[in-house]
Design a protein with these regions (language model features):
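A preference for well-ordered globular domain cores
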Residues: 3-161
């Protein structure tokens, strides 16, 4: 099974501390962040179609190699979208894929770090248990980088007039 589901903690009768629940929640959020990144991205390429690219560690290494090929001036670079046959991509398409992958990963790593700081600030088991990956993080726990990345995605969602 690729993805592991997480069940809410059920009291086994043992003493449950805030620290125990906090550490469990941080581990759960870390796993979801990792799964989200590995799940990958949809990227629209120069042919006008969208393709899905997984971002497992191996995929990330492959994309780094492809980026180097593009920088070295290789005009047609072989690669494949998920479930697709290998084909040649232009330098522009490879750069589009790599930049989208970097942005996606940067956002999720930055988001998780802010979420972790927020979780560490919580003092009740109920508040910690209520934390969900993807929730809005209070501004006091958002880094400058996270605020910047959020503003970029908000600006991208606004159609130009």
């Amino acid at each position: 099974m690729l993805f592991r589901s997480y069940e809410p903690y059920e009291d086994s009768g043992e003493d449950v501390t805030v620290e125990f629940v906090r550490n469990g929640k941080i581990a759960e959020m870390s796993a979801i962040c990792k799964q989200t990144i590995y799940g990958g991205i949809e990227v629209e390429l120069s042919d006008g179609n969208s393709y899905h690219f997984a971002l497992t560690l191996e995929d990330q290494i492959n994309l780094t190699s492809l980026e180097e090929m593009a920088k070295d001036g290789v005009a047609q670079i072989p690669y494949h979208a998920d479930g697709e046959l290998c084909k040649f991509y232009s330098v522009a398409d490879i750069i589009t894929i790599v930049e989208a992958a970097k942005s996606f990963k940067s956002y999720h790593v930055t988001y998780f770090n802010a979420l972790k700081a927020y979780i560490k600030s919580l003092e009740s088991i109920e508040d910690i248990a209520a934390v969900q990956y993807g929730m809005s993080i209070p501004a006091a726990y958002q880094s400058d980088v996270l605020r910047y990345l959020i503003s970029l995605s908000a600006n991208a969602a606004v159609p130009e007039e």
